[in-house]
Amino acid sequence: MEDDGKSSPKLPIPGKRNILITSALPYVNNVPHLGNIIGCVLSADVYARYCRLRGYNAIYICGTDEYGTATETKALEENCTPKEICDKYHAIHKEVYDWFGISFDKFGRTSTPEQTEVCQAIFNKLWDNKWLSENTMQQLYCDTCKKFLADRLVEGSCPFEGCNYDSARGDQCEKCGKLLNPTELKDPKCKVCQNTPRIRDTDHLFIELPLLKDRLEAYIKKTSVTGSWSQNAIQTTNAWLRDGLRQRCITRDLKWGVPVPHEKYKDKVFYVWFDAPIGYVSITSCYTSEWEKWWKNPENVELYQFMGKDNVPFHTVMFPSTQLGTEENWTLMKTISVTEYLNYEDGKFSKSKGVGVFGNDVKDTNIPVEVWRYYLLTNRPEVSDTSFSWTDLQAKLNGELLSNLGNFVNRVLSFIAKPDNAGYGSVIPDAHDAESHSLTKSLAEKVEKFVAEYVEAMEKVKLKQGLKTAMLISSEGNYYLQASQFWKLYKEDKPLCAVVIRTAAGLVHLLAQLLEPFMPSFSCEVFKQLNLPPQFSLSDERGEVLLASRPWDILPPSHRIGTPQPLFKELENDEVARYREKFAGSQSDRRARDEAANLADQLNKTKLSDAKKQKASSKGGGKPKPQPAADREITMARLDIRVGKIVKAEKHPKADALYVEEIDVGGGEIRTVVSGLVKYIPLEEMQNRMVCVLCNLKPAKMRDIVSQAMVLAASSSDGSKVELVEPPKTANIGERVTFPGFEGEPDDVLNPKKKVWETLLVDLNTKENLVACYKDVPFTTSAGVCKVSSISNGTIR
């Protein structure tokens, strides 16, 4: 989704905020996976859309990083030229980002004449200013392949103490993140032939980072504060400075890259770390011939850069050093937004190894793009690693998008669309004296506060907080509708009902504006249902932010809306199980499974004679008998865990360590439960708590009181802390807690001799994100997953 080129390129405008936004250039060695997408292009897209929403003059520049060893390696794998690999994967990346709705102003590439021109010009400046030196270095040479091995063509064990990762690349260890030289690896191997290379001398050019240290440190010290750098960026950069800057090689013994414009080194190319960040500049030069107005205009342009944490030193140390070394008036990076890693289920996403869900996979799931964007952004790993899981995606779609946001919008618009005498005939009603209605006034005050918090978060590039705040407005809207009882007001007090409905319709409009950076297709659909053109604006200059304090004035009376439609569809358990199975393992594993399935299908088709002899149910007669509970497989489906509410809790009259609770487990049933929680949870905190209750244990007498169920709680690893496992507050009392992928009816009563509970108990735990799980499957309700307050990696009993 790029500027189509018909409009004139944007240039900085004096007196306006001019913001240049870049995303780390994705490499063309594979299809981008979800971790790549949230770490770079999607996060930058949200901020770019926010800037446009606010009326700032912003451009978003990105493209594929195409030179270097990884491209040559991939070309060897696919038996084609590096240029063919780049053409193929550039098109794939573009298609994926278009599907995700990424709003680049220019999505280019680095294998262009413009890249060569800009890169060589910067090199010449560094050479003229004497920031470069020549040196002989030792490099690994493969006698079998008859060539020097670039960093990514070597793998071995990481040399750093405490790491020893056995698949470290020659340029960087993926596990500990440290940058390496290939000769530092222990037990190195050539990735092409798997033979052990030898060390050989070769001459190269280096940038003298130690000589630039004072200028660089002054820039970092000032800008990291004024630009509000993310903490992980500051920590990584300070670690580099603390460990001491070294001269860094900027040339490589390769063919695929920007040629070095120096007679002695004309057979070498620039190292990708030196070349790739310059790609931002060259891609901008493809966008406009007046690119210097963006890149050499620090007085009027703010540069915001987005990337994953492994790219930090190249953008806070290397690229600024290169710019400073030219002694030209470059626009240096002001703000850097860095993400940690997004992990996949039990392990890591890996583009090179093909592990995880990839950008081209998501189109085949039939899950809409707005759901993918929302899930990735709510799960954005801003300060620590986060994990993608199919059950969490399901919980967020069903519990947040469908039950909260979609429910609010559809409820409001559907009521307006009802015919006269049942609704408003699709016309926004007129409303008077909204300020005098206390519930409406209270709502407006909350919304005004939330919008201010949203703007503050987004200005600081705290995208996850901005999204969370916008969703709180939707929650307040749902509460407002429920508390107002508008369906009664429509019959009993039509003027007041008009106030409520017009105010709620204004909130729908406001939510579409606030959420456009995150879910543009959702916002376009809402505006379509409001019968409005998809033009989004939240400008201070036009007073649109102030309207948040008067939501009843956002939409004019007599405005005719369009046709309301459901905005989200529930994701079912069987779909989640199917996706989890489909995307298990690596891409090569999936291909092998598909081939095996196709082979099995072909074999089945050849067994026609057997099929004729055994016509499905021709002889058996009747349905198969249900399997006795005693013989069933032991899975979580056999447990009857329900959402309960403690209506009364008191000390056991005959045991100091026990509580006796009366718990509502739904259907009008109150059960007596005895729990050994006195040492861990104060009595006052037990009152009126939502809890998870195991209801099909055999009743047991505990000090003369029969306990009819068990309250589930988590304990810390040392046993010093215990917390209740709590369902979401909006979960229905009595509903069954489920475990996606484990379907079936529970046993009436668990047979103690079969040890069903004891078998399953060992795999009940809490995760880093405090979600209660069986193995990695969350305790799930219709309102979302069950959690504990603070115990991560705990055990549940």
Curated annotation (Swiss-Prot):
> Disulfide pairs?
none
Question: Which positions fall inside the tRNA-binding domain?
Answer: 635-738
What segment(s) does the record annotate as region Disordered?
A: 601-634
User: What PROSITE patterns does the record tag this protein with?
Assistant: AA_TRNA_LIGASE_I, TRBD
| MF-aspect GO terms | ATP binding; methionine-tRNA ligase activity; tRNA binding
Can you quote a single GO CC term?
Answer: cytosol
* Extent of motif 'KMSKS' region: 348-352
**EC number(s) stated in the UniProt entry for this protein:** 6.1.1.10
Q: What is this protein called?
A: Methionine--tRNA ligase, cytoplasmic
Please spell out the taxonomic lineage of the organism that makes this protein: Eukaryota, Viridiplantae, Streptophyta, Embryophyta, Tracheophyta
